[in-house]
Amino acid sequence: MAMIKNIFLVTLLFSFGIELYAERPASDQADEDKFGNKHDWCAEVNYDHTLIIVDTTEKFNENQYELLQNQILNNSSIAKLPPYDRISILDLTGRNITATQTKPVFSKCRPRSGEKSSQYKLDQPSFWNPKEKMQQAYNFFNQDLAKARTHFDELGELSGEFSMIMELIKEISRVDGLNFTDGSGYKNRKLIIFSDLIQNSENLSIFTSCKKGKCITWDSVKDAPKIKALMPAFKSDNKPEVLVYYLQCKYNKNLNNGMRDFWTGYFTDAGMKVTFDTETACLESKKNT
């Protein structure tokens, strides 16, 4: 059952790239960017962009950490994206840094892999596009991705004072440098949030109510001016779709405190389609013996 769950999760995380993928022409700009330091291995055309927010304000238990590393940020999961799609990873730390100051841990386009067995024709080598050249760029890409995973390895017991989830979503909707705004030119955008969803900032905190077993409702706060000011700036008809991988075990083990209803209300009012997935099982962290 765990394997079935993992396959489902990977499919859910990166499915739009497969479903909406149409055969793309080869890009000299991307293919000649050997180290990815000129154009991030991106083509002249902006295709799709998947942005992952990893909320590390509450330290992970071992099971959550393994899920992040082995199912979401691993090489094979990212390989599900079509060539030339951009993948970005943001760390929401809450540690002496505001949402505005948050920069990507990783943001590159997925180069062609050189794999004959790939479902994407662009990945498959040819006389004009030899396997060795493709795999060289792809290996450099995976090395950069490994550095991003190492970033989360090094967090240890750190936890943050604030959890500015809404603030960060607002920032990615309006900051051009994150390549996720309506004006970024990407045909499709997907936002993945890996979090316990405990919004906790000066603008809005749901920590106390949710911890007591019943979260405040979205309707009770949404009309406040400072909450309206936090709403995402996405205005186009083709807004990003959202997948929330909800780490419910610590504060909402039975999924009955209204947390998902709160965030469903938020995303609905933002005009964004949201899907939730949850932890498979709430297990205690392993202790050293």
Where are these regions (language model features)?
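Acidic, polar low-complexity linker/tail segments
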Residues: 21-52, 57-65
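Extracytoplasmic/secreted cell-surface and envelope-processing proteins
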Residues: 60-64, 96-101, 199-204, 252-257, ...
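Hydrophobic beta-strand segments of well-ordered beta-sheets in folded domains
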Residues: 44-52, 83-89, 189-191, 232-250, ...
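Von Willebrand factor
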Residues: 46-186, 190-192
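A cross-kingdom marker for long, charged
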Residues: 243-244, 249-289
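VWA/integrin I-like adhesion module and closely mimicked acidic/polar interface patches used
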Residues: 198-255
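Sec-dependent N-terminal signal peptides
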Residues: 4-15
